[in-house]
């Protein structure tokens, strides 16, 4: 079954609020085998909403509306759909009683326009609103399914989970949708796609969807099957084929992130970390401390932006700063080794480079060195040539730090 989500509200068109409902619904619908092929946003206008309904009826089996169920004159969704389907609006007695009780409890006047929220399409299945006033509803008519939901996410989401999804399962084939996201770092989207292009071209079940975001690449693998275990087997087979080719860049699944994976390995191996940050100015340390319980592995850091701090606090030799420069492999090595010693950690990591927009020390923006000093291991410096804005270069440098830390910890 194919669905279209129609979000109603002028505030969405004006960009005053984000349409988070559509994202939530698309994910939930996909999980029960309903394909969402279109998202539509329309303002609080009867004529344009009617046009949107007519277009959606031509291309979708299910029309899901969010918003426009409230008490004001610009809440037009129910009235417009009722007119389109030649259906009457009738009061739902349970909803009316619930709304009336709310006004009595709060000592407010129960005005006529608030009764409007209890109106539903005649013959519809009514979805109780446990977190608000206006109920939702579902109606199967003329071979189409119409779902009307409130606009506020705090009302819509629990309504969907409790009442709407069980209703929608009556219209699905019983197939389960199983998805797994593979996360990669250190390889561009185009490079990764070339390595798995034949798998993407030949995809049927499961499907493979690449996405690049914040310097990372993900592959979403999605399989359909009536049996969840069989769907997982389909996913696993394709995952194995992918990792045979690009496994060196793989680091995690779904909502696993680089900094969490690195911290997890530090804890597992009982190692402590210290950082020396010039280029990143504390970004790396800030992300480290986003993980709960990190004090057991993170000693601290030094923001060594000025060369005086590099020289007098972290003891980078003056001749290195004068000859090689602060943005150099040698400087990164000294910073990593010396912050490790200074803070008595097992591992020291350093960041030095040019964020831009101008060149520095005759080195172009994006020139970056990440140093990694681990006890009983030779110090390694990773040269990077990054692109992007000043902030993007700094953020990507921190990510590369987590990536190289994670990969090195996997080896030892």
From Swiss-Prot:
InterPro entries named among the record's database cross-references: CinA (IPR050101), CinA-like_C (IPR036653), CinA_C (IPR008136), CinA_KH (IPR041424), Competence-induced_CinA (IPR008135), MoaB/Mog-like_dom_sf (IPR036425), MoaB/Mog_dom (IPR001453)
Pfam family, one: MoCF_biosynth
Gene3D superfamilies, sorted: 3.30.70.2860, CinA-like, MoaB/Mog-like domain
Stated family: Belongs to the CinA family.
Protein name from the UniProt record: Putative competence-damage inducible protein
The species this protein was found in: Bacillus cereus (strain AH820)
Gene: cinA
